[in-house]
Amino acid sequence: MGIKPTYIKKIGIELLEFHEEKFTNDFDENKKAVASATNVPSKRVRNRVAGYITRKINTGKFKK
């Protein structure tokens, strides 16, 4: 889908650092986790953050 905006990456990385145990390699579960861990007002931003987190976990590119 292209390069993600900086604000999506920033939110995703912060969530992974502070709430890593909530996230898995399943997009639908990550959507719920993002909704519970943040107060993101729009569904589109929530889904983009969840997709970014899922992609990071599946590719193994997230490091503590």
Curated annotation (Swiss-Prot):
Keywords associated with the record: Ribonucleoprotein, Ribosomal protein
Record-annotated membrane-spanning stretches: none
Any one Gene Ontology molecular-function term assigned to this protein's record: structural constituent of ribosome
Keyword Nucleotide-binding attached: no
Gene Ontology biological process: translation
One GO CC term, this protein: cytosol
Superkingdom to which the source organism belongs: Archaea
Cysteine disulfide partners in this protein: none
NCBIfam families, alphabetized: PRK01151.1 (NF002242)
Family per similarity comment: Belongs to the eukaryotic ribosomal protein eS17 family.
Listed HAMAP family: Ribosomal_eS17
Protein name according to UniProt: Small ribosomal subunit protein eS17
Originating organism: Methanospirillum hungatei JF-1 (strain ATCC 27890 / DSM 864 / NBRC 100397 / JF-1)
Name of the encoding gene: rps17e
